[in-house]
Curated annotation (Swiss-Prot):
Protein name, as recorded: Small ribosomal subunit protein bS6
Taxonomic superkingdom: Bacteria
Gene Ontology cellular-component annotations: cytoplasm; ribonucleoprotein complex; ribosome
Record's signal peptide: none
Keyword Hydrolase in annotation: no
Organism: Clostridium botulinum (strain Loch Maree / Type A3)
Family classification: Belongs to the bacterial ribosomal protein bS6 family.
Keyword terms: Ribonucleoprotein, Ribosomal protein, RNA-binding, rRNA-binding
Matching PANTHER family: MITOCHONDRIAL 28S RIBOSOMAL PROTEIN S6 (PTHR21011), SMALL RIBOSOMAL SUBUNIT PROTEIN BS6M (PTHR21011:SF1)
Amino acid sequence: MRKYETVFILNPALDEEGYKANVEKFKGVIENSGGTVDNVDLWGKRKLAYEVKKVSEGYYTLMNFTADTELPKELDRVFRITDTVIRHMIITQE
């Protein structure tokens, strides 16, 4: 099992409930695949450094998790097919 960190930005058109529901969805993907979520840090709505997909702000979330090496590929797939995700990044912690 390895430690990973992901940051994802969600569409600002979501309300607070939609934002938290999406975060829970991604936590569920990790936990249902045998991983554990170590930390979730909700940064809230912030301005983007540059416009992405015609939006200039978004809901930022930092999530630390522990999982096997296949889980980041599945999480990346889920991020890509979720319309509310503007940007995401998954890195390995050392």
